[in-house]
């Protein structure tokens, strides 16, 4: 989002929702009423960054969380991929043609071809992986090499990206 500085701002109102694990906690509704200030969102933010920079980045991260109906917790936050996809289209003005693909339904060469096509078109890929026991992680693939090695942004403040 920061690389493309998109969207200029969210649209509509995200309805309030209740956390699944804590029925006493309700995430309030949010109306998108101001543009994102992309010039105040550097690629990297740390504890020494100015407060206004931290606030802008925090706003974007929170907005991405609520449009995905994220389940916020003390140790982790999670969301269903389907909710994230729906929220990106409905509230962040992403193309309605944006869709989900399942790797299990394709042969590997076809899968790599599809990933490269998206990346060549300058469309980073929101990717999810999970274990049979239900654990998982959502991350971004934003580049590749000719040998089908992909660059992954794991979403851990730059830790272990590559």
For every predicted segment, state its role:
Residues 1-44:
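Active-site nucleophile-adjacent alpha helix/oxyanion-hole segment immediately C-terminal to the catalytic cysteine
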Residues 3-5, 37, 77, 110, ...:
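Residues in intrinsically disordered, low-complexity segments of regulatory proteins
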Residues 1-4, 53-60, 66, 70-88:
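Active-site nucleophilic cysteine motif
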Residues 42, 48, 70-71:
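N-terminal leader/propeptide and maturation segments of large enzyme subunits in energy/redox metabolism
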Residues 86, 90-153:
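Active-site-adjacent substructure of cysteine-protease-like catalytic cores
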Residues 8-10, 63, 160:
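Intrinsically disordered, low-complexity segments enriched in small/polar residues
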Residues 155-162:
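Conserved catalytic-core surface of thiol
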